Amino acid sequence: MIITENQIWDRFNTVKPISIDAKWYEDVYSLELSIQLRFAIGERLGLLADKGWEVIKSLIEKHGFQRELIQAAGLCHQREAYDFLLKILREESIPKINTVRALSCWGAIIPTPDLKNILKEESIHMRLAGLNLLRFKSHLLNATEILELVEDLLDDFREEVVIEVIKILQRRDEEKIIKCISQIAIYGTDPTVETALIALGSIGTKESLIALSSLSRNLTNRTHKQMAYKQISHQYLNL
């Protein structure tokens, strides 16, 4: 019996995802379905955890590394799925961005060398996805390790990348982190300078106050100077 897309959507709208047997999703999945429906099937399979993973594996064997199936592998939160995703991440012939995004829930345990390779990619999408992984792993790393990972990204011409790096760094209070953020406040573009100054204010330590005081004296841009003074006033309230 052939089931239509409308019939599949109708079932989705009337039955809870976890109430549908995983095998049913496998039976109705097809590359001829709309991409929206294929992603919906993948999301529902991900909710089925280990049972969903068994079907996801089977569908990947039949249909290859489809985006919705890679995403589903990440959503099912199974350790075997993590091992699978890490393996295909290391395969040069397979597009990596979907795999990196699927690994997001495992950011804390992804090996540092793999994370470093992700962050070295030139694509903005890869770098942002890699920074999302680093966000979950950074508390397990020391300041030197973090700075080594983001070293190339600090010079990225895309402000969005640099801003995301600052947001990760501002959760730390080590002196070398503060110095790094201060350098961005001196040499960055308007958006990155402003983000860096706010970051120094949010760190709220004596070292970051000293850095802001120096910046308030040495920055040549009037707006940036005023922002540095504003962050100093915030720090005095917190110290």
Task: Show the residue positions of the predicted features.
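Structural detector for internal amphipathic alpha-helices that build alpha-solenoid repeat scaffolds
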Residues: 2-16, 26-48, 58, 65-79, ...
